[in-house]
Amino acid sequence: MSKPNILLIVIDSLRSDKCISKNLSSITPNIDFLIKNGTVFPNTISSAAATAVAMSSIFTGLPPFKIGMDTINYHRLSPDIETYVKILKNNGYKTHATAPSVAEDFGLICDFENSDSTYRNYLSLFDGLGEQIIEKLVNGSLNTPWFFYMHIFDLHTPITVPKSFSDKKFGASKYEKQISAIDFWIGKIIEKINLKNTLIILTADHGEYVPVIEYNNKIINLEASDNEAKLWKMGNRIPNISPDSALNIKKKIGGLLRNTRAKIKKQKIDELNLSPYQKRVLMESRMEEGHRMFDDLIKVPLIFSGLNIPSNKKILQQVRHIDIFPTIEDMLSLPKKQNVDGCSLLPLMQDKFLKEKPAYIQNPPSIKKNSKKIIGIRTSNYKMIKQADSDKILELYKDRKSVV
């Protein structure tokens, strides 16, 4: 029997509650198709609300502190660390990636074989990227068995919604309209795949705040404007003269955008009597200081579909990012990775008992200097957050309803 292909779709910034829920405003027939023909884990916890940290944990099956990604500053994943991508290569898989350039900045695509493994962060599925992906799937360049890591950046803020999805029927916010737009391309992509011989995994690196709330029967929407999105794209067009210089310029432009947006938001909501949650959603950024371990930022979807995955199954037990590749390893009977903290979720899919494991979480590196390292532990029933160099507990949520 030939080895199955593996397609890992990572939708940057996709929250679990915005694609796996009964009350969605987005139109997502293709994500729904994957769920109907697979198993979904809506309570999947990311290690951190930052691409570099989260993807490093996914690819290694290890928490950030075991792979050198728990520092207060951003840096690259060491090429000496064993990843599941290397294991797949050593077991006959051709490894391909289509990922934003931020993945290259942080050493996430070192083990992929194709020379066009990254694209500029500003490039959308609707700017030709979608067609490039489909061309790879149909032109025979992906020699079987293949592992294809596809990282979609269209939902990353600031969002530019394509005109064809700007109608309110596609979503109650820019964020939700963009999910509808991305779903359109997911449909075009899976049309080109043999689902009987391909394992599809759809997840996100982290979630995001969606600054849209209902207040006194009115909608307050503080999502980034189209002009802000244009400025962000301009910043990402800066050529990589050197990785460090380009990153520094991009950080400065990003900081300018965040500061400007924060001032505008503050002026608009200062006089409103908002709850702490409403203030956080409207005012805070995923890139600001603080622990940034609220569920809006770290709870992501996880869907296994295709191949012989049990159909239309929803498993509510909490699972973790670091469990994704141990599950793939188990499904495909690959040699076991020696150094791993994640565990296979296959027993849950087979209706067997698997004890819930606590999820280690941490704040991502801050864009500001002198930020403090904050860590946490999350289960279904509690979340504990503390400063790494202190015994002082910063936050403690003690029951299921208050874990946020």
Model-identified regions with their sequence ranges:
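Catalytic domains that recognize anionic headgroups
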Residues: 1-404
